[in-house]
Amino acid sequence: MITRTKIICTIGPATNSPEMLAKLLDAGMNVARLNFSHGSHETHGQAIGFLKELREQKRVPLAIMLDTKGPEIRLGNIPQPISVSQGQKLRLVSSDIDGSAEGGVSLYPKGIFPFVPEGADVLIDDGYIHAVVVSSEADSLELEFMNSGLLKSHKSLSIRGVDVALPFMTEKDIADLKFGVEQNMDVVAASFVRYGEDIETMRKCLADLGNPKMPIIAKIENRLGVENFSKIAKLADGIMIARGDLGIELSVVEVPNLQKMMAKVSRETGHFCVTATQMLESMIRNVLPTRAEVSDIANAIYDGSSAVMLSGETASGAHPVAAVKIMRSVILETEKNLSHDSFLKLDDSNSALQVSPYLSAIGLAGIQIAERADAKALIVYTESGSSPMFLSKYRPKFPIIAVTPSTSVYYRLALEWGVYPMLTQESDRAVWRHQACIYGIEQGILSNYDRILVLSRGACMEETNNLTLTIVNDILTGSEFPET
C-alpha cells in the first residue's frame, strides 16, 4: 500500500550510497533531504547523482530537497570532543581555532558577539547542553555549564530570548542555492525564516539564479517566525515545523499547540506542511521506537501534516531503513482512522493558491460526489500543479492521480498529501486518462471495475471545469459511457 502522508529522509553518511538510497526508496521514502549545514558540494553532488539515477531507474517521483544553512549559530571545529561538566567554564571566540577545553572554541558567525548579553541562556546541540553567559566581550563569550555533556564540531547553538540581527541569507546560502539550481534540485527549505520578506528575498535570489519557480518551504524555528506566521504561510509554498530549534528558542511546552496551529493554517492557505525533528530519535541507536514516538507520528498526521521527516535517524543512525519502515507502518495504520469529513470544513478565505472560481467550486463538489459514489481515485490533468494541491488540502478518502507534462511539477507534487504524480507527454484527454488508469492499476490504487472521477478542461475552456464519473475498464476498452 502507498502512504498518503509523505516521508522525507535526510541523507547523510549512513545512507549516501546507491545501495542504501535504494533501500530507503523501497522502504517508503518520497523526498530526499540534503542538509547544507553539513557536507560539501562534492558530497551533495554525489548524492544528487545517485538519487537522480535511482528515480530514473525506478520511474518514481522522488523529490530532492536543498535545506539551507541559514543564519544559524554553530560551534567551530573541535578535533577531539570536549567533555564538560556542571560549573565548568569555557570561552567561545571569534578567531578560527581548533577547539579545546583550554584554548576555547570558535563560534560562527563572527559578528554575533556584540548581540549576546551577560546572563543569557545558551543551549547547545538541540538543547542537550545548557550554559549561561558569565562574560561578554566584543570578540568572545565565557560560558558556565549548567549540566554535563560532550561538545562536538559544528553543533548548533541557540541563545534563548535574544534576537540576533543576522542577515537572512548568507554568502554560503547564495552559493548553495546557485549549486541547487545548477543541479536542478526540486525544492528548497529555507532555514530560520523570520519575516514574510525573507521568502521574497529568497525568491528573488532564485529568479536571479535562473529558477524563479523553485518551491520554497519556510522553516519555522524561532519566535519571530511564529509571530509573523500568517504572512509567511501565504508567501511560502510550504511550511516546515522545525520543532528542534523551535523548542529551544521558545519553551518546549509551547510546541504542541504551535504545531497544531501551523498545520491548520497551512491547510487553509493550500500549502503543504512538514512536521520535523525527533520523530523517531531513539532509532538512531535502537532497533524499535518508543511508544511516545509512534504516537507523535500519528498525532502529526491527525493534525494535518502533509509529510513527516526523519533527520539523524536516516542521516547517521544505526537503523535508517528500519526507521523508514516503522514510519510507513505508523502512517498506514493512522490513515485508516483519519477523519476525512473534518477536513472538508476548512476556511477557504485564507487560501493563497491561485485557483479559479471554477476549480474552487468544482473541486470541492467533485470530492463530495466521488465519496458518495465510492470512487477509488480522482484523476486530474495539471500543468502548474495547482489543481491537485487545492484538492489535497481537503484530505479526500481516495488518492489523487495528478497527470502532468511538467517534470518540475511531477517532482514537486511528491510532497503533497495523497497526490500520486504521473508524467506524460500526452495532452489528448483520451490518451492521458488511459495512461492514468494503467498507472493506478500498476500502483495498486485501482482495479478494472473501480469507479473514478476525472477532472479536466472542457473543449472551449482554459480552466478545469469538467467532472466525469466513470469506470476504469470503460476507459481502458474505449467503451466509456459516463455515469454522470
Swiss-Prot record:
The cofactors it requires, by name, are: Mg(2+); K(+)
Q: Which InterPro entries match?
A: Pyr_Knase (IPR001697), Pyrv/PenolPyrv_kinase-like_dom (IPR015813), Pyrv_kinase-like_dom_sf (IPR040442), Pyrv_Knase-like_insert_dom_sf (IPR011037), Pyrv_Knase_brl (IPR015793), Pyrv_Knase_C (IPR015795), Pyrv_Knase_C_sf (IPR036918), Pyrv_Knase_insert_dom_sf (IPR015806)
Give me the reactions it catalyses. Answer: pyruvate + ATP = phosphoenolpyruvate + ADP + H(+)
Per the record, where is site Transition state stabilizer?
219
Sequence positions that bind K(+): 35, 37, 67-68
User: What pathway is this protein a component of?
Assistant: Carbohydrate degradation; glycolysis; pyruvate from D-glyceraldehyde 3-phosphate: step 5/5
Q: Which residues bind ATP?
A: 35-38, 74, 155
Quote the record's binding site residues for substrate.
33, 244-245, 277
**This enzyme's EC code(s):** 2.7.1.40
Instruction: Name the residues that bind Mg(2+).
Output: 221, 245
Look up keyword Cell cycle and say if it applies: no
This protein's record includes keyword Transport = no
Q: Name one Pfam family in it.
A: PK_C
Q: How does it assemble?
A: Homotetramer.
Query: Which family, according to UniProt?
Result: Belongs to the pyruvate kinase family.
- NCBIfam families found in the cross-reference section: PRK05826.1, pyruv_kin
Listed name of the protein: Pyruvate kinase
Organism (species)? Chlamydia pneumoniae (Chlamydophila pneumoniae)
Q: What is the lineage of its organism?
A: Bacteria, Pseudomonadati, Chlamydiota, Chlamydiia, Chlamydiales
